[in-house]
Each structure stands twice: as structure tokens, then as C-alpha cells.
Amino acid sequence: MKLTCALIVAMLLLTACQLITTDDFRGRQQYRTARSRTKMQNYKIFRLTKRCDAPNAPCEKFDNDCCDACMLREKQQPICAV
């Protein structure tokens, strides 16, 4: 009997907490998945339009921002390939 009463009180408390928090966030969570999907698409577009170094710009072997590839040259600094 005590366990049943404790469960009922706990359920009422949790229900009250949910109702209180939904009143606080009314209008803020609307279309949450659509907004996150739009943000993800914008991020993908941003990644696809990343600026790259011009051809013949100096680069590093492992860390470069070349549009195509970093061309290694003997006894000279590597440059971005055309």
C-alpha cells in the first residue's frame, strides 16, 4: 500500500514538472527538427564552399588548404598544384 502511494505521488510530481516546463518553453521548440536540418544543410554548404589556396601558393605536406593537391618539390618548398 505504501509503495503504491509512493508511486502515485512520484507520477503526479513528474507530471506536474513536465507541465511546468512545457509552459516555460512554449513557442521555442516549434519545428526543432526542421531547424536542425536547415543548420546541417548550411554547414554542408559551408564545408563545400571552403576557400582554398591559389595554385603555386606555398603549402605543407600534411596540413594544407590547396584546392587540388600539394605538390612536393625536391630541395624547394612544396606548392599547391594547378
Curated annotation (Swiss-Prot):
InterPro entries attached to this UniProt entry: Conotoxin (IPR004214)
Proregion positions: 23-49
Any Pfam family hit: Conotoxin
Keyword 4Fe-4S: no
Disulfide bonds: C52-C67, C59-C70, C66-C80
Coiled-coil stretches noted in the UniProt entry, renumbered to this chain: none
Molecular function terms from GO: ion channel inhibitor activity; toxin activity
Domain of life: Eukaryota
Signal peptide: 1-22
Subcellular location: Secreted
GO cellular component: extracellular region
Tissues showing expression: Expressed by the venom duct.
Key words of the record: Cleavage on pair of basic residues, Disulfide bond, Knottin, Neurotoxin, Secreted, Signal, Toxin
Comment text on domains: The presence of a 'disulfide through disulfide knot' structurally defines this protein as a knottin. The cysteine framework is VI/VII (C-C-CC-C-C).
Family that this chain belongs to: Belongs to the conotoxin O1 superfamily.
Protein's UniProt name: Conotoxin MiK42
Organism, as annotated: Conus miles (Soldier cone)
